[in-house]
């Protein structure tokens, strides 16, 4: 099995984009991953929306900050909750090319990067 990558997505008011973001991560050719969406908002409707998105795949987890912490602290919280050997960040309004993780992991292993 490939080494697990924890993909951390800080979420704040990106409802119109986040599903496309999650789908782009799920469509990675490197599939040993978990997705941690760090909910950094107070709108309960958005939290329910994210919970629906999490039903797309059992590798998706929603972590609720319960108060506004900002993107940096949300990323830190994601790291604390992660299980992966590797950490990757993507913003909730971004997408990845399908081979992004595969190429990054391959490059790091090939060049003996210390983890």
Residue ranges and their predicted role:
Residues 1-115:
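Nucleotide-sugar donor-binding/catalytic module of glycosyltransferases
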């Amino acid at each position: 099995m490939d080494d697990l990558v924890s993909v951390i997505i800080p979420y704040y008011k990106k409802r119109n984009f986040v599903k496309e973001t999650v789908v782009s991560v799920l469509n990675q050719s490197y599939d040993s991953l978990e997705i941690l969406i760090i909910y950094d908002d107070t709108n309960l409707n958005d939290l329910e929306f994210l919970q629906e998105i999490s039903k797309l795949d059992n590798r998706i987890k929603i972590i609720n900050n319960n108060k506004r912490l900002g993107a940096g602290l949300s990323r830190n919280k994601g790291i604390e909750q992660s299980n992966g050997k590797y950490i990757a960040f993507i913003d909730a309004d971004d997408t990845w090319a399908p081979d992004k993780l595969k190429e990054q992991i391959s490059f790091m292993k090939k060049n003996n990067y210390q983890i």
